């Protein structure tokens, strides 16, 4: 069974978003997503200051099985990308909710996300 953390919100496309409390957010892919993809071999991250529109693909995670796009949950601006993933993409597998986060972003329009209970229901 996939780990789902109560302190995050989730998208239909299996990304998690953590509200940092200051109009900034941290984002990654869920435990369910990383398990389906398998061992990560590469993560293509956006650049700091990139502006991304809602539902646009802005990041790619590549595993031994497949490459998968990561989609924006809102209109946002990237403020940090997890550079540790350049050398250790496997952090997405071993620590998807902690060390394996993908980006931090600013946004005033993060809406329509699921809480942990709703996300668990779509996995069942």
Curated annotation (Swiss-Prot):
<dbReference type="GO" id="GO:0005829">
    <property type="term" value="C:cytosol"/>
</dbReference>
<dbReference type="InterPro" id="IPR017453">
    <property type="entry name" value="GCV_H_sub"/>
</dbReference>
<comment type="subunit">
    <text>The glycine cleavage system is composed of four proteins: P, T, L and H.</text>
</comment>
<comment type="similarity">
    <text>Belongs to the GcvH family.</text>
</comment>
<comment type="function">
    <text>The glycine cleavage system catalyzes the degradation of glycine. The H protein shuttles the methylamine group of glycine from the P protein to the T protein.</text>
</comment>
<dbReference type="Pfam" id="PF01597">
    <property type="entry name" value="GCV_H"/>
</dbReference>
<feature type="modified residue" description="N6-lipoyllysine">
    <location>
        <position position="65"/>
    </location>
</feature>
<dbReference type="GO" id="GO:0019464">
    <property type="term" value="P:glycine decarboxylation via glycine cleavage system"/>
</dbReference>
<dbReference type="InterPro" id="IPR011053">
    <property type="entry name" value="Single_hybrid_motif"/>
</dbReference>
<dbReference type="InterPro" id="IPR000089">
    <property type="entry name" value="Biotin_lipoyl"/>
</dbReference>
<protein>
    <recommendedName>
        <fullName>Glycine cleavage system H protein</fullName>
    </recommendedName>
</protein>
<dbReference type="GO" id="GO:0005960">
    <property type="term" value="C:glycine cleavage complex"/>
</dbReference>
<dbReference type="InterPro" id="IPR033753">
    <property type="entry name" value="GCV_H/Fam206"/>
</dbReference>
<feature type="domain" description="Lipoyl-binding">
    <location>
        <begin position="24"/>
        <end position="106"/>
    </location>
</feature>
<keyword id="KW-0450">Lipoyl</keyword>
<dbReference type="InterPro" id="IPR002930">
    <property type="entry name" value="GCV_H"/>
</dbReference>
């Amino acid at each position: 069974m996939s780990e789902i953390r109560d302190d995050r919100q989730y998208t239909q496309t299996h990304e998690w978003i953590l509200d940092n409390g200051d109009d900034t957010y941290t984002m990654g892919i869920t435990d369910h997503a990383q398990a389906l993809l398998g061992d990560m071999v590469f993560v293509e991250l956006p650049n700091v200051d990139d502006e991304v529109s809602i539902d646009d693909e802005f990041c790619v995670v590549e595993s031994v099985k497949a490459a998968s796009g990561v989609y924006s949950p809102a209109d946002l601006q990237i403020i940090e990308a997890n550079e540790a993933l350049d050398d250790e993409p496997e952090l997405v597998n071993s620590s998807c909710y902690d060390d394996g986060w993908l980006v931090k972003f600013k946004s005033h329009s993060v809406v329509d996300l699921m809480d942990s209970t709703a996300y668990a229901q779509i996995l069942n």
